[in-house]
């Protein structure tokens, strides 16, 4: 590369992988410029191609080598899990602790296997194709290799919870059906995430760009003395960002001295290069004060010194650089990487294992004197000591060599004072990162078998809610389930057995009787299904012999007509064999007596009607006619139209004939006087009123009404009298008054009933009967708008059911008359139906079976209360009935102890019995000399050299859980006996980072988050104000604390995903989020309370007010999310182009806002040159003058080598180290 012969090249025998290659190219770029670095990258590419094409690397099944250690590892893991299950079965750990232990054991196994895979490839097969691909960075990653040749490991279900059954096989061995289905959750989630989260990532970038697009480097130095302290970022004892990495490209905010002496290392405003950063680290300096965009005092911009290097070029950032856009893209772009990564791993769980401290040799542990410990229980249910403050343990080996071990507060200690430990033993466990968000979760404890409940050492309190009472566990203990067969018996079963009875196989336990509530005739129906027998009890039957039913077929329709002995003809409205309900319409009388030709006005005369009712089918109101009377009908034809009055073909008051066209294509059906109702030139109705117009008579002047009836003999006009009942009303035509006399039709409605006759075989006829009902659908005085006419009164036959028989099924049947086959007879039947299970039907459990016997015969007439059938319940097991429980909320239960529920241990006379009757024993307990019980349970008998133990299962229940059973309760297998409440870490796939980033940047006020930034900002501000700081300083300091926290939080999320982002990018965004304050009191400014304004702007106003001795504005700092910050930007054009366009522009118009076009977006929208890059006007900046610039260029020119003839430039297109140094005066 270089022509300097004094530098000797050195040979380095090392594998150059992806990261080494990156470092090499960065070094070449930083030291030799872009042209030489590009050339070197080109030659490296050629070298790579040369060797890559010498031999093709293929992938075959043989390359997928499974490490031999896998089988032993799986065996060890399964043994550990079996030990955990044994502990659980002995009631030593809870279901939650068992689950956590199983998860952690498999997770640890998966992690160990991953290391074994790497070790195997490295040591045994370094030229393996898959190993070379993965570890050179060409293709795949360690997670994928692990799944190919190690084990797939634990998977997450659709809710994000871990399934405790891992996939122990890999893709090389192949998956079982179970493995495949467990895998499918993550696979689908990966595909969905790829689609959805890509959009989320893009939207995040858009919001970031919008919030920071106006941040441009506008000046060289803001001359601030402020800065931020940089340290290594450490989380959970892991260095995420080293101090060296954080320092490169920064500018010192103070002189830096060697801590060992007073020697100056670097001056104020010195740029920190990699060499200087190395020197700072080598001197042991752990924190450095540097300039930062957060503390920059430039107005509406950032200065060069506070920003530092442009990391792309490795030199100070240029003036006019749009650093806001760069920052937004730097933070937003990795979002896509976070998204895509889930797809590759397919939902494989990557949980955080607690970091354990393992002894490297045999030694003795010694506690320090100041140690403070408290007893605790680990999440696996083991006993441990909780370290209450940071300590140092002494470890003494057998050679008295001493080493120390530091433990932080919150660590778990597993060894006692002066205890001897072996190599590989776990000494302690560091606390899992407290940054993980936990959530309250529930775990149901289900009964593994049926039996009775025994509560041991549990303290319970009742909590009453609106719906039910909960039993809350105050002090933890054990729930025992003592085995037995539990039968749930139907509620109405009559038991034949009692407690302590011994029953044999096929013994009768109880019986259920089916009793008829009604008397009637029995009909045993033909079976439709093999095991169900239907019985019908006909409670009433009524055949009408004075009604003939004629059936007629027309156009595919069947109509049934009823003809009474009075020759009234009805049409049947209910289909035969259809269920009938009370007050159902059965038939309608066919008649035209009450049919009108048109609409009109209806008036009742001596007509008694019921209260208004509603027809459920048509939703119309109707009235039943209670007693006979008359209906008066004043006919009129009403046409409802909505047309302009100019389209009318008739005029108001005109007498027209039938068939007259009143509007185009609308003709009248009757003759009469035209009455036009119009509104604002639009005709609403045209009414044709039959009658005669008479000139106005003084006879009507004394009447207070404008319409009414005239009886026969009353005066119409000028001694003209009426000879019948008529209707009169005032009528105005062209401002002249007339009297319109209209004819009245009188409809007589007599009272009428039908006397029905029944056949001799009818019985219980009072249960259901038919009733003749006349019904009117219009109220008194109602005006019916119609053209064609209506039925004023309709006559129906209605079914009436006895109130006690409403639960019965009622049907209408048509049977052919035996004497005359052309007619049918109508029969109404009511019945009660019983469905009985057949004799051979087996009950839902194999331990019980039933037999059902019919106790009646077909056509038998029975009384109410007769037993129709009996179901008998038999046990298929033999044993002792220990308990019979009855309670109001559930069916009775029987507990039967059989030989299957007990275990007998035989002993001889020489063995001592170590248990008593009713003792509870655990698996592994010694019950007699040299006899170890391999089961848990209760001793129920000791006699004849035999110990009988009833099988049992203890369940450990932790404090705070909810209990669902009572002591001595009987439960069946699979029932929930308790719900454990515990805290768990919120798990998720690898993309969990993206929502967290969004949550921080949007400054969401989440209740379940362990840190609320809004609360912290407010409390810090109040604290500083109370300490006596002025408003500006209190705001600045509280904002600075929050800014540093937000930067760290965002870095933690990205670093945990393996994504590196320079702090300065995040600082630029955070600066925008924290640049505003909210006015509390405007003082003598023009600002109103609640207004959001820039901190720098309000402080300048306050300075001016202070000089003028006026009242200053009061304010407090606020944190705005990126969306809110974008909408609250000074430029309304930028805000409107982002979101809520109408609102933003309306607000700007009302407020008469000005847009100074400072940012990029607003200039692009207007069509101006953007104020960045070449569009940045350097001459407007007073701090930079042409002389300074000229001097710096000249100085740089002088530093160029004078003798350039000896330099070899043939590999350089443009030497970018020198190109930018030429003066503008040079003619290039």
Curated annotation (Swiss-Prot):
Where would one find the signal peptide in this protein?
Answer: none
Q: Catalyzes what?
A: RNA(n) + a ribonucleoside 5'-triphosphate = RNA(n+1) + diphosphate
Q: Which UniProt keywords apply?
A: Chloroplast, DNA-directed RNA polymerase, Metal-binding, Nucleotidyltransferase, Plastid, Transcription, Transferase, Zinc
- Where is this chain's protein located in or outside the cell? Plastid, Chloroplast
Its required cofactor(s), as named, are: Zn(2+)
Give the EC number(s) under which this enzyme is classified. 2.7.7.6
- Which Gene Ontology molecular-function terms are recorded? DNA binding; DNA-directed RNA polymerase activity; zinc ion binding
Where does the chain bind Zn(2+)? 222, 296, 303, 306
* A Pfam family matched in the record: RNA_pol_Rpb1_4
Q: Which GO terms describe its cellular component?
A: chloroplast; DNA-directed RNA polymerase complex; mitochondrion
Name the predominant localization: plastid
- Complex formation: In plastids the minimal PEP RNA polymerase catalytic core is composed of four subunits: alpha, beta, beta', and beta''. When a (nuclear-encoded) sigma factor is associated with the core the holoenzyme is formed, which can initiate transcription.
> What is the annotated role of this protein in its UniProt record?
DNA-dependent RNA polymerase catalyzes the transcription of DNA into RNA using the four ribonucleoside triphosphates as substrates.
What family does the Swiss-Prot or TrEMBL record give for this protein? Belongs to the RNA polymerase beta' chain family. RpoC2 subfamily.
Could you tell me what this protein is called? DNA-directed RNA polymerase subunit beta''
Lineage of origin: Eukaryota, Rhodophyta, Florideophyceae, Rhodymeniophycidae, Gracilariales
């Amino acid at each position: 590369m270089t022509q300097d012969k004094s530098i000797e090249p050195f040979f380095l025998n090392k594998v150059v992988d992806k990261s080494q290659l990156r470092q090499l190219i960065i070094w070449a770029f930083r030291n030799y410029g872009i042209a030489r670095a590009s050339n070197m990258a080109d030659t490296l590419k050629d070298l790579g191609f040369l060797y890559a094409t010498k031999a093709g690397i293929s992938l075959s099944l043989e390359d997928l080598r499974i490490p031999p250690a896998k089988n032993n590892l799986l065996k060890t893991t399964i043994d550990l899990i079996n030990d955990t299950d044994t502990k659980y079965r002995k009631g030593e750990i809870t279901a939650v602790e068992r689950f956590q232990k199983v998860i952690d054991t498999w997770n640890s196994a998966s992690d160990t296997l991953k290391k074994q895979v790497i070790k195997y490839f490295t040591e045994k097969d370094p030229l393996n194709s898959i190993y070379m691909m993965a570890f050179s960075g060409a293709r795949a990653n360690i997670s994928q290799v692990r799944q190919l040749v190690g084990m797939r490991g634990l998977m997450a279900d659709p809710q994000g919870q871990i399934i405790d059954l891992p996939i122990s096989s890999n893709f090389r061995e192949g998956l079982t059906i179970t493995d495949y289905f467990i895998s499918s959750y993550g696979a689908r989630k990966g595909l969905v995430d790829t689609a959805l989260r890509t959009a989320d990532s893009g939207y995040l970038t858009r919001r970031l760009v919008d919030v920071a697009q106006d941040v441009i480097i506008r000046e060289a130095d803001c001359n601030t003395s402020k800065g931020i302290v940089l340290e290594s970022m450490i989380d959970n004892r892991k260095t995420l960002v080293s101090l060296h990495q954080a320092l490169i490209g920064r500018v010192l905010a103070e002189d830096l001295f060697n801590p060992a002496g007073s020697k100056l290392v670097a001056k104020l405003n010195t740029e920190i290069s990699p060499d200087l950063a190395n020197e700072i680290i080598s001197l042991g300096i752990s924190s450095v004060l540097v300039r930062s965009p957060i503390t920059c005092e430039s107005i509406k911009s950032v200065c060069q010194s506070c920003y530092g290097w442009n990391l792309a070029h490795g030199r100070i950032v240029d003036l006019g650089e749009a650093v806001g856009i760069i920052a937004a893209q730097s933070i937003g772009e990795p979002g896509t990487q976070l998204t895509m990564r889930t797809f590759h791993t397919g939902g494989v769980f990557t949980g955080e294992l607690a970091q354990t401290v393992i002894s490297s040799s045999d030694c003795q542990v010694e506690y320090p004197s100041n140690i403070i410990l408290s007893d605790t229980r680990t999440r696996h249910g083991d006993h441990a000591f909780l370290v209450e403050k940071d300590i140092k343990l002494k470890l003494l080996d057998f050679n008295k060599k001493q080493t120390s071990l530091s433990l932080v507060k919150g660590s778990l200690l597993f060894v006692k004072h002066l205890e001897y430990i072996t190599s590989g033993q776990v000494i302690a466990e560091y606390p899992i990162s407290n940054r993980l968000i936990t959530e309250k979760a529930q775990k149901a404890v289900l009964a593994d078998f049926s039996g009775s409940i025994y509560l041991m050492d549990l303290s319970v309190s009742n909590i009453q809610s609106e719906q039910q009472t909960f039993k809350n566990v105050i002090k933890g203990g054990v729930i025992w389930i003592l085995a037995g067969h539990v039968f749930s018996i139907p509620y109405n079963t009559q038991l034949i057995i009692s407690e302590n009875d011994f029953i044999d196989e096929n013994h009768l336990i109880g019986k259920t009787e089916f009793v008829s509530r009604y008397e009637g005739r029995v009909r045993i129906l033909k079976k439709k299904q093999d095991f169900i027998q239907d019985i019908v009890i006909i409670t009433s039957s009524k055949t009408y012999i004075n009604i003939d039913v004629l059936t007629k077929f027309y156009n595919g329709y069947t109509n049934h007509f009823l003809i009474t002995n009075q020759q009234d003809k009805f049409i049947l409205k209910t289909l035969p064999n259809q269920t009938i309900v009370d007050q159902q319409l059965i038939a309608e009388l066919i008649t035209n007596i009450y049919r009108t030709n048109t609409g009109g006005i209806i008036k009742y005369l001596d007509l008694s009607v019921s209260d208004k009712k509603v027809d459920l089918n048509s939703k119309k109101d109707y009235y039943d006619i209670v007693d006979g009377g008359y209906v008066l009908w004043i006919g009129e034809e009403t046409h409802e139209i909505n047309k302009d009055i100019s389209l009318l073909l008739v005029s108001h008051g005109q007498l027209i004939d039938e068939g007259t066209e009143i509007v185009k294509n609308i003709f009248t059906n009757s003759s009469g006087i035209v009455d036009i109702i119009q509104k604002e030139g639009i005709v609403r109705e045209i009414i044709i009123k039959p009658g005669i117009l008479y000139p106005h008579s003084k006879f009507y002047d004394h009447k207070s009404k404008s319409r009414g009836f005239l009886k026969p003999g009353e005066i119409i006009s000028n001694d003209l009298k009426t000879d019948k009942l008529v209707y009169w009303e005032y009528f105005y035509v062209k401002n002249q008054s007339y009297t319109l006399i209209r004819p009245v039709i009188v409809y007589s409605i007599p009272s009428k009933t039908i006397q029905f006759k029944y056949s001799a075989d009818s019985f219980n006829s009072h249960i259901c009967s038919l009733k003749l009902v006349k019904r009117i659908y219009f109220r008194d005085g109602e005006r019916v708008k119609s053209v064609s006419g209506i039925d004023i009164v309709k006559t129906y036959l209605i079914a009436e059911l006895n109130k006690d028989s409403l639960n019965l099924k009622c049907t209408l049947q048509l049977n052919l008359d035996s004497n005359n086959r052309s007619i049918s007879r109508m029969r109404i039947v009511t019945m009660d139906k019983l469905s009985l299970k057949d004799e051979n039907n087996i009950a839902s459990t194999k331990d019980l079976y039933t037999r059902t016997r019919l106790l009646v015969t077909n056509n038998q007439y029975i009384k109410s209360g007769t037993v129709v059938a009996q179901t008998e319940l038999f046990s298929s097991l033999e044993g002792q009935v220990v308990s019979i429980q009855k309670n109001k909320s559930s069916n009775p239960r029987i507990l039967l102890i059989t030989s299957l529920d007990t275990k007998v241990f035989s002993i001889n006379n020489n063995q001592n019995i170590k248990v008593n009757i009713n003792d509870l024993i655990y698996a592994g307990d010694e019950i007699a000399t040299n006899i170890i019980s391999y089961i848990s349970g209760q001793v129920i008998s000791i006699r004849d050299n035999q110990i009988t133990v009833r099988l049992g299962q203890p369940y450990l229940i932790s404090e705070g859980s909810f209990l669902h059973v009572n002591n001595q309760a009987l439960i069946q297998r699979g029932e929930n006996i308790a719900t454990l409440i515990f805290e768990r870490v919120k798990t998720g796939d690898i993309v969990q980072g993206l929502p967290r980033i969004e949550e921080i940047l949007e400054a969401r006020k989440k209740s379940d988050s362990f840190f609320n930034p809004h609360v912290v900002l407010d409390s810090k501000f109040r604290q500083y104000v109370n300490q006596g700081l002025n408003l500006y300083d209190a705001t600045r300091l509280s904002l600075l604390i929050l800014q540093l926290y937000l930067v760290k939080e965002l870095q933690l999320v990205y670093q945990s995903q393996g994504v590196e982002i320079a702090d300065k990018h995040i600082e630029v965004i955070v600066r925008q989020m924290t640049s505003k304050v909210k006015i509390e009191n405007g003082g003598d400014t023009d600002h109103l309370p609640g207004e959001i304004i820039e901190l720098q702007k309000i402080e300048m106003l306050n300075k001016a007010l202070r000089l003028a001795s006026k009242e200053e504005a009061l304010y407090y700092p606020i944190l705005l999310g990126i969306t809110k910050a974008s909408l609250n930007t000074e430029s309304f054009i930028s805000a409107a182009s982002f979101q809520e366009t109408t609102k933003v522009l309306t607000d700007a118009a009302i407020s008469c806002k000005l847009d100074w076009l400072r940012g990029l977006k607003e200039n692009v929208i207007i069509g101006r040159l953007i104020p960045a890059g070449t569009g940045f006007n350097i001459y407007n900046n007073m701090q930079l003058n042409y002389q300074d610039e000229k001097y710096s260029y000249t100085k740089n020119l002088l530093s160029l080598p004078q003798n350039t003839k000896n330099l070899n430039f043939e590999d350089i297109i443009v030497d970018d180290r020198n190109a930018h140094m030429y003066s503008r005066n040079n003619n290039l």
